[in-house]
């Protein structure tokens, strides 16, 4: 839940944002927000998150927080790009995605004329990006080669090597054999990370609000399930 009570302009100023844009598509009912934090290093790149928010304030808080993080992610990676993010506000948790919704989002993204480049995030996959690509060229992460493909395996690989570096820093070597790892969230990135850790010999404790994701982690990687409220207290390395 959102904790800040400042106005939208005050929140933007505090985080250093350039733009915060709202959109409603009458035909599909799409409600979406794009936040551009910075274009100092180039056009702003950031994923599209499709999520159920309990309030508009929660959605604004999330998109501002995430877009600022993207600025630093791009900069630390040496990319000539700025940071942005977008969120699609689902009317309820079980609201199914449609091509019409994705194309409406694509049209919204296209209004930025490349200043914002969308990509995958929670609730958005390669098919959704390909649907968006019917309306705009300013997307990455679709199924076609020209759109870059699913970034989840590469994100997971980066996290895996980051965890290995943490083991070394802690004086625990770089071997995951016998180590216990707790993962909060086992969606696209989480499943790929589970696979890498399992193959490296780690024992897994997982938590997720999606039962299908949990079942996959248990069946394929022998993971132990923890409640989402308990995962941060799980005994692990």
Predicted regions and their residues:
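Glycine-rich phosphate/diphosphate-binding loop of Rossmann-like nucleotide-binding domains
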Residues: 150-237
């Amino acid at each position: 839940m959102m904790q800040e009570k400042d106005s939208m302009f005050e929140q933007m100023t505090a985080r250093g944002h350039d733009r915060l844009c709202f959109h409603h598509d009458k035909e599909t009912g799409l409600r979406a927000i794009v936040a551009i934090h910075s274009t100092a290093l180039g056009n702003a790149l950031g994923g599209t998150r499709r999520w159920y928010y309990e309030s508009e304030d929660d959605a604004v808080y999330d998109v501002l927080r995430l877009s600022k993080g993207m600025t630093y992610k791009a900069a630390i990676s040496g990319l000539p790009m700025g940071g942005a993010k977008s969120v699609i506000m689902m009317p309820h948790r079980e609201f199914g995605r449609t091509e019409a919704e994705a194309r409406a989002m694509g049209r919204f993204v296209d209004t930025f004329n490349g200043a914002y480049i969308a990509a995958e995030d929670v609730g958005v996959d390669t098919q959704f990006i390909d649907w968006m690509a019917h309306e705009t060229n300013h997307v990455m992460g679709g199924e076609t080669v020209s759109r870059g493909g699913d970034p989840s395996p590469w994100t997971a690989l980066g996290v895996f090597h980051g965890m290995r570096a943490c083991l070394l820093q802690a004086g625990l070597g770089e071997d995951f054999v016998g180590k216990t790892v707790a993962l909060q969230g086992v969606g696209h990135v989480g499943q790929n990370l589970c696979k890498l850790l399992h193959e490296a010999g780690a024992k897994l404790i997982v938590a997720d609000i999606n039962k299908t994701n949990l079942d996959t982690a248990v069946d394929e990687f022998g993971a132990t399930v923890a409640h989402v409220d308990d995962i941060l207290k799980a005994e692990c390395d």
